[in-house]
From Swiss-Prot:
Keywords: Ligase, Phosphoprotein, Pyridine nucleotide biosynthesis. The keyword Protein biosynthesis does not apply. Its EC number is 6.3.4.21. Pathway: Cofactor biosynthesis; NAD(+) biosynthesis; nicotinate D-ribonucleotide from nicotinate: step 1/1. Catalyzes the synthesis of beta-nicotinate D-ribonucleotide from nicotinate and 5-phospho-D-ribose 1-phosphate at the expense of ATP. InterPro entries: N/Namide_PRibTrfase, NAPRTase_N, Nic_PRibTrfase, Nic_PRibTrfase-Fam, Nicotinate_pribotase-like_C. It is an enzyme of class 6 (ligase). Belongs to the NAPRTase family. The gene is pncB. GO terms for biological process: NAD biosynthetic process via the salvage pathway. It comes from Bartonella bacilliformis (strain ATCC 35685 / KC583 / Herrer 020/F12,63). This is Nicotinate phosphoribosyltransferase. The modification Phosphohistidine is found at H242.
Length: 424
């Protein structure tokens, strides 16, 4: 891979538009895995995805120029999958499986186009929605987040001169390498890049991936970013996300179907995937509710991704459940991916080492940690908690409860209904 002087590139903004998203493959791998299932099983479902800034103190509409945002969104609308990209998806091996993407799905992808967006402003925030068929609207999630995140980074650095930018990136690289030095001390650790959605920039994510590849070698198992996986000959990694049970639950017409919704998703998933792709995401409506109602066959799956409980607490609860089901945790896999920093990774690794197989999906703290790197304090280089989630399905409100109340999504009445329902 060619090395880019990131500071020079940031400073030399002499072009009309510097596209943030240059390929539809610049997304998380699980979006494509989910898309194949959505396209195959739920072609008639219409959804809305919405941008949600959890940190209301950060006024995105004041930080980011609306014209620049529209220009980036419009450019992304123009993107199509290239012939090279389709051939790579068809011919590559993912998770040890050949032809994981079926020919009819890839043929459909050849003409794929993102639906239009709806953008307005209110109280210093952008109101950004994507309406349409689930199989189309879903693919806006990652580009929307990367565009907002990188535009905010660019705005924060706009007034830095070339020397200040050199200092910023030199310090950020040194900071990143110090993390790698700590990770190298953990035998058999498995680290993956899960940092696409809230990255500082595409070029910075690429540098971080190169650094991990160089620094920890075989302990770096791959990246969730499909474009980077293709360009760097890394494994593309990812399983499934909360949007699946959120939509399926929203479509239900009775209590029995609502209770079964999280497991219906798993049954749908197993029609398409196997092996290490059989990873359970249990926390959409609370992990306790999921485990309490889970059919016996769920324990046969390869592993779990505890995504919103504290890692040690969440992992221990799943290990306890496996033991209750007569399974050996040492043969199972836990994927930790929520708000990881090196301290958390070290503590979690030492706690579970030898008890269970582990992979760490390292996200925002990998690809957007610029705290104290600038020559002067720049508040807008701090990361904001930004998500783009499904908010309705066929006109019905979608809900996510999570194990962390701060991550709850949905209108208050539906949230309360789900809380009451899944609490017993």
């Amino acid at each position: 891979m060619n090395h880019t002087d990131i500071a020079k590139r940031v400073y030399n903004h002499t072009w009309k538009l510097d596209p943030i998203v240059r390929s539809l493959l610049d997304t998380d791998f699980y979006k494509l895995l989910m898309l194949q299932m959505i396209w195959g099983l739920y072609p008639d479902v219409h959804v809305t995805f919405s941008l949600i800034n959890r940190n209301k103190a950060i006024h995105l509409a004041d930080d980011i120029d609306e014209g620049e945002l529209r220009a980036q969104l419009d450019h992304t609308l123009s993107l199509r999958f290239t012939k090279k990209e389709i051939i790579w998806l068809a011919g590559n091996t993912f998770y040890g499986q050949k032809q994981i993407f079926k020919p009819d799905f890839l043929h459909w992808l050849e003409n794929f186009q993102l639906p239009d967006y709806e953008l307005s402003r209110k109280d210093g925030q952008y109101i950004l929605h994507f309406h349409g068929s689930w199989a189309y609207s879903s693919m806006w999630e990652i580009p929307a987040l990367t565009i907002i995140s990188e535009l905010r980074s660019r705005a924060a650095m706009k007034n830095l001169d070339r020397f200040a930018l050199d200092v910023l990136y030199a310090r950020a690289k040194a900071k990143m390498w110090s993390k790698i030095e700590r990770l190298k001390k953990l035998p058999d650790i498995k680290i993956s890049d899960f940092g696409t959605r809230r990255r500082h920039s595409f070029l910075w994510q690429r540098w971080c991936v190169e650094a991990l590849k160089e620094g920890i070698g075989a302990s770096f198992t791959g990246t969730s970013n499909v474009l980077l996986a293709m360009d760097t000959d890394l494994e593309a990694l990812g399983t499934n996300a909360h949007e699946l049970p959120m939509v399926i639950a929203a479509l239900t017409n009775n209590d029995d179907d609502l209770r079964k919704a999280p497991y219906q998703v798993l049954q749908d998933w197993k029609r398409y995937y196997e092996g290490n792709l059989l990873i359970v995401l249990p926390d959409t409506f609370g992990t306790e509710a999921f485990l309490r109602n889970a059919p016996k066959w769920v324990a046969d799956w390869t592993g779990f991704r505890p995504d919103s409980a504290p890692p040690i607490e969440g992992g221990e609860r799943i290990i306890q459940w496996w033991q209750e089901q007569g399974k050996k945790p040492q043969e199972k896999l836990l994927i930790f991916s929520d708000a990881l920093d090196v301290d958390t990774i070290e503590k979690t690794y030492h706690h579970f080492h030898g008890k269970v197989r582990m992979i760490f999906g390292w996200g925002t703290n990998l690809t957007n940690d610029f705290a104290n790197c600038a020559p002067q304090e720049i508040a807008d280089l701090d990361v904001t908690s930004l998500v783009c989630k499904v908010t309705s399905a066929n006109g019905r409100p979608a809900v996510k409860l999570s194990d962390n109340p701060e991550k709850t999504i949905g209108n208050p009445q539906e949230i309360q209904r789900y809380l009451n329902f899944f609490s017993h």
